[in-house]
Amino acid sequence: MIHDAVLDYYGRRLATCSSDRTIKIFEVEGETHRLTETLKGHEGAVWCVAWAHPKYGNILASSGYDGKVFIWREQGGAWQKIFDFALHKASVNIVSWSPHESGCLLACASSDGHVSVLEFKDNSFDHQTFLAHGQGVNSVSWAPSTAPGSIISTNATPAAQRRFVTGGSDNTLKIWSWDAASAQYRCEEGGVLSGHTDWVLDVDWSPTVLQKSYIASASQDRTVRIWTSDSSNPGVWQSRVLKEFDTTVWRVSWSLSGNVLAVSSGDNKVTLWKENLKGEWACVNSLED
């Protein structure tokens, strides 16, 4: 079974991972594709693959049931595993690279309840690991590097923020940000978001940098929630239920512009949602397998 499939920044390479413990790299040209590499090393199913921004080179991260995170790099047409992390005691469910403006940072979410953040610089990695959700972490998503509202602010350009959201088996979302004074990631004040009645399976922070921040969450309680926070009142989050679906909702994903949300549910359907001028969310398309 293939668990993840991700195109690189330019859409020319596709990485997939599966239950057979392998990662496959395909070259994509038009409507054709060609297998160019099979990467091995994980000792269990591989759940997730993620491409780093190309400014850092051809770098791919992978995570799996074996609790390991691998960093792979292509040089001279050959792929090599350059880092092998065993920071977790249970399955690492997802890995996510930060916006490149924030640095070369990789957040890893594990069933052991911890999140690790790896920072790559000068050909070495530093890491921080902290308890996020005691019953397990299922998902993680970075905020845009630019704070909401800042692009229309008259103030000087702020430093890129390091901020992300996690979703856990304790039915909550949590907002984390880098605290320079303590050199640690801390849960923000007002950053524990409650509303779901079952596991939060996926979260996605919208890339929009307008007046509001948007986070979408998918849950085993069969709902998708949209969480919003206005730049004029940071730290205060409000949520509304997008819809109660007939089955578990597995994944949510924003478009690059941040105005369309794709929802994948257990009935083999993908629905696309958009907010109208009244602030109401409506389904604009439905795709069925």
From Swiss-Prot:
It holds the Pfam family WD40. WD repeats lie at residues 1-36, 41-82, 87-128, 132-186, 195-237, 244-283. The keyword Cell division does not apply. It is found in: Cytoplasmic vesicle, COPII-coated vesicle membrane; Endoplasmic reticulum membrane; Nucleus, Nuclear pore complex. It is a peripheral membrane protein. Keywords: Cytoplasmic vesicle, Endoplasmic reticulum, ER-Golgi transport, Membrane, mRNA transport, Nuclear pore complex, Nucleus, Protein transport, Repeat, Translocation, Transport, WD repeat. One of its GO terms (cellular component) is COPII vesicle coat. Its main location: membrane. PROSITE patterns: WD_REPEATS_2, WD_REPEATS_REGION. InterPro entries: G-protein_beta_WD-40_rep, Sec13/Seh1_fam, WD40/YVTN_repeat-like_dom_sf, WD40_repeat_dom_sf, WD40_rpt. It comes from the Eukaryota. GO terms for biological process: COPII-coated vesicle budding; ERAD pathway; mRNA transport; nuclear pore localization; positive regulation of DNA-templated transcription; positive regulation of ER to Golgi vesicle-mediated transport; positive regulation of protein exit from endoplasmic reticulum; positive regulation of TORC1 signaling. GO terms for molecular function: structural molecule activity. The COPII coat is composed of at least 5 proteins: the SEC23/24 complex, the SEC13/31 complex, and the protein SAR1. Component of the nuclear pore complex (NPC). NPC constitutes the exclusive means of nucleocytoplasmic transport. NPCs allow the passive diffusion of ions and small molecules and the active, nuclear transport receptor-mediated bidirectional transport of macromolecules such as proteins, RNAs, ribonucleoparticles (RNPs), and ribosomal subunits across the nuclear envelope. Due to its 8-fold rotational symmetry, all subunits are present with 8 copies or multiples thereof. Component of the coat protein complex II (COPII) which promotes the formation of transport vesicles from the endoplasmic reticulum (ER). The coat has two main functions, the physical deformation of the endoplasmic reticulum membrane into vesicles and the selection of cargo molecules. It also functions as a component of the nuclear pore complex (NPC). NPC components, collectively referred to as nucleoporins (NUPs), can play the role of both NPC structural components and of docking or interaction partners for transiently associated nuclear transport factors. Belongs to the WD repeat SEC13 family. This is Protein transport protein SEC13. The gene is SEC13.
